Amino acid sequence: MKSSIFIKSAIAMMAAVALGASNASATVVSREKVLLETVISAEGNVTQKGIIQRVKVSQPAEAKKNDKGVTGETGFGEISVSFSEPVKLKDVTRTEYATDTEAGAAVKTTSEVGMLLQTEEVEKHEQFVKNKWDLSLPRDVKPVSFDDGSIGFRTDTENGVSAVSETRISTPWAVDKHGNPLETWYEISSDGSSITQVVNTQDIEGEIVLDPRITYGQGVYYNWYGSELRTLKAESAASFALAVGYGCVNVNRLRHPALVAVAGLMCVTAGSVVGIEALRFALDNFKESFKDHSCYQWKFGSHHITPVAVKGNCSL
């Protein structure tokens, strides 16, 4: 009799535990569903209103989720963008998302695009919300801000030429719970290890969604001031041909500093100096005078040089 009572009690206890686990699981699923609905709605709103700035890359590289954010390969090496707060991202079955419901965080990857979506609760009269995103960058690569508010990645040399990856974090966006866009911008930390997204929330309260969107590409752009390009253009075609012959192994044997600088940078960022012949054609094709303090850009392998904004492209 006592044995029967014990068995019934054990079964009842197991049923209670199972029911508790089932309820807990249902709660997690419910939170996950709400979070996904929130971020998908926000993304849909900004897409429909044309707020999301799409970046086109010539050599797409796959954006991959990890347990902290997204990562991908560039011409400079691996670049990662992560949530600054601790998160435990878990893939959501049959979707492109990974989420952490406790942190209100989600990540989405589609081909070369990675998105980190964060929900924040804004209190009444709270003027600004600041959310930090951590960056993991290759050595000697730093984040730079462009005129449109987007973030790029650049490496500089001591001889004036710089290289910018086509990988870019788009102009930031943030929306309130009704899908209305909010004023927002990025600030780069002094050591380049993070960016902070600042959102103007002084006229709202309630939930907001904010997001950095990174597009990965392996293409590389090279930038000079006009005075430096003029020096490079003065080099003979034979010198450029010699650079190709030397290759990356013997690039330092070149005599001219301007040529050594760009050839060496090509080896580091594009893996080859062969494209320098195309640069020679691009210099010949540019018929205007190079202006000393203007910034000019050449895409690896192309036959054209174009003027670009100084900010973000040419080192200051």
State where each predicted segment sits:
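Residues that cap or anchor secondary-structure elements
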Residues: T27-Y216
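Short hydrophobic membrane-inserting alpha-helices and related fusion/pore-forming segments
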Residues: A243-S272
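Hydrophobic core
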Residues: M13-N23
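Soluble non-cytosolic domains of exported or imported proteins
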Residues: H125, A238-S239, T269
